[in-house]
Amino acid sequence: MPSSWGKIFRVSTFGESHGTSVGVVVDGVPAGLPFPEEEIQKDLTRRRPGQNDLTTPRDEKDRMVVESGVFEGKTTGSPILMKVNNQNTIGSDYDEMAHVFRPSHADYTYSEKYGHRAHVGGGRSSVRETIGRVAAAGLARVILENELGISTVGFVDSIGPIDSNITEDEYPISRDLVDQFPTRCPKASANEEMETLIRKLRDEGDSVGGVVKVVVRNLPPGLGDPVYDKLDADLAKAILSISACKGFEVGSGFSGTRQTGSTHNDEFYIEEGTGKVKTRTNRSGGIQGGISNGMDLVIRAAFKPTSTIKKEQKTINDQNKETILKAKGRHDPCVLPRAVPIVEAVVNLVLVDAYLYQRALQPKWFMKYANLNAIPNQ
């Protein structure tokens, strides 16, 4: 079961929902980097369960433990192991699911592929796997912010039929603003409607999906490679690997198919004062030909409704007999509020790997775009 990602900044996650712990081993972190323990813990707290009544009532504090790769507050260049101990597990909630497959869940496909599965909490298919990715991305964010000045902010763009209707004119949106709203939709009117919808469906034993939008500012041109290692292809694979994610788009995405070339093309110009190459619109979402073009990277990720719900559903068991399931346990009625820091994290993991790869292969590019004073041991 593959559990690793990256060429240079390599991330390997481990653990299961109801196991002893979940975590990550990160290879390729440069030595001498100040270890951002407090910032990583803040990121983990943003994604943890039990934040409010819109999320699962499972109350995990998700306190990080660092076991290697850090000495006297700085990275050593050796693999960094970070983990979180699972503390609030109730395995008996899943007794019925030992032999019954939840509709639209990974239960059936894991069983068919491996012939044996950890049914409690969904095992590796649980969103708790992303704890390791969020922890690793805390390191990635330090590199990206310090060396390139990059800012990555995500927010909930829609839940069910309710759209945020946030436009580019309202950028930049700060993480502090996003976190003021329980749904992480930074538009007060839409947030209120979303809260009402989530609570209604939760009380009915149902769930709802939606879309997370992420905007990356100050991304330099040149990241990504043509054909098979395109930046948008890497982002798509990484983001679609998040539990419950079913769709991905960059820039105009599918809506661009409704336009003509003359209306969709992003015209270039030279920015007065800086001499930088810019585009008058950003329908490309910051990527052209699989390579960043210096404009904001704009992506959207679609999440399906949580598959484990308390309403009765028709399904089958592992004896190929039809049956009825009314799931027990503690589950998110909507994953979107907690998905925001997860999608941000995955975006940063892809970007830091692309940056370190470009930095190694293209010294002239590195000298042109990186803040050399922020790089340890230089």
UniProtKB/Swiss-Prot annotation:
User: What keyword terms does UniProt attach to this protein?
Assistant: Amino-acid biosynthesis, Aromatic amino acid biosynthesis, FAD, Flavoprotein, FMN, Lyase, NADP
Q: Whom does it interact with, and what assembly results?
A: Homotetramer.
Where in this protein does the record put region Disordered? 37-60
What family, per the record?
Belongs to the chorismate synthase family.
Name its pathway: Metabolic intermediate biosynthesis; chorismate biosynthesis; chorismate from D-erythrose 4-phosphate and phosphoenolpyruvate: step 7/7
Q: What is this protein called?
A: Chorismate synthase
Q: Which organism is it from?
A: Leptospira biflexa serovar Patoc (strain Patoc 1 / ATCC 23582 / Paris)
Write out the GO biological process terms. Answer: amino acid biosynthetic process; aromatic amino acid family biosynthetic process; chorismate biosynthetic process
- NADP among keywords: yes
